[in-house]
Swiss-Prot record:
Residues 1-8 form a propeptide. This is Ferredoxin. Residues 9-100 form the 2Fe-2S ferredoxin-type domain. It holds the Pfam family Fer2. Coiled coil: none annotated. [2Fe-2S] cluster binds at C46, C52, C55, C85. It comes from Trichomonas vaginalis. It is found in: Hydrogenosome. Transmembrane segments: none annotated.
Length: 100
């Protein structure tokens, strides 16, 4: 019998100067974690499909994979801006900090 291994981690989200630690499971998007925590609204968005650019956040610290198909939404944004829906979380993101 195969056992399914699920990895967890924690990120910190900062909104309005208030820090909140949020747990995640591998392969969840940052968008999902933030909306489930009530820190980001899914209303009037593409629902995490990398098509609207409304879930921009700032990557403050920690490890995050390089941006890929989100560049068109980030052209006029600071260098640390990312789309929450384009960040798929894994154990390597444990401890990362994002500002909303």
């Amino acid at each position: 019998m195969l056992s399914q291994v699920c990895r967890f981690g924690t990120i910190t989200a900062v909104k309005g100067g208030v820090k909140k630690q949020l747990k995640f499971e591998d392969d969840q998007t940052l968008f999902t974690v933030l909306t489930e925590a009530g820190l980001m609204s899914a209303d009037d968005t593409c629902q995490g499909n990398k098509a609207c650019g409304k879930c921009i956040c700032k990557h403050v610290s920690g490890k995050v994979a390089a941006e890929d198909d989100e560049k068109e939404f980030l052209e006029d944004q600071p260098a640390n801006a990312r789309l929450a829906c384009a960040i798929t979380l894994s154990g390597e993101n444990d401890g990362a900090v994002f500002e909303l």
